[in-house]
A protein has these predicted regions:
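ASCE RecA-like P-loop NTPase motor cores
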Residues: 1-147
Length: 147
């Protein structure tokens, strides 16, 4: 059994195990090596692994819609929030299991330094220059939308 977890080369691909064994395998690799990125073929498969692994250890989910056309038409707010929560957790502590699908893996992401610099904190009672705030939001990639 020890040879099974003695991986010398990354990335590695695991085939031929049932879902429960793959889950245990991923958890054991995490315990031995630390951070692990699990890339699944589909969003459904990634969600299945996330549900299974999160029962045993804390892990993060980075979901992206499987189809580019659906991203262009309408971005799911739930998926977007989950991705932001995952990125925020990774900035705090990068020793995690992150589970994503192929589209999540291919997604362009900012560097950690740029992501940290883009953090805006506005508290109740703060005075904010609306023009500076709008310009900052534009710089971060937001766009103005009519309601």
């Amino acid at each position: 059994m020890l040879k099974l977890f003695d991986i010398k080369k990354f990335p590695s691909k695991v085939n031929g195990l049932n879902e429960e064994l793959k889950t245990e395998y991923i958890i054991e690799l995490y315990k031995k090596y630390g951070s692990i990125l699990v890339v699944c073929n589909t969003l459904y498969e990634a969600n299945t692994y996330f549900q299974s692994i999160s029962k045993h250890v804390e892990c993060l989910f980075f979901p992206m819609d499987d189809f580019l056309t659906s991203e262009a038409i309408a971005v799911s707010p739930e998926l977007k929030v989950t991705r932001l929560e995952t990125m925020n957790e990774l900035v705090k502590n990068n020793n995690r299991i992150v589970i994503t699908n192929m589209m999540g893996y291919l997604r362009y992401l900012p560097t950690i330094e740029l992501y940290k610099k883009s953090d805006l904190k506005i508290k109740l009672g703060d005075t904010v220059d609306i023009h500076k705030l709008v310009n900052k939001l534009y710089d971060l990639g937001y766009s103005r939308e009519s309601v």
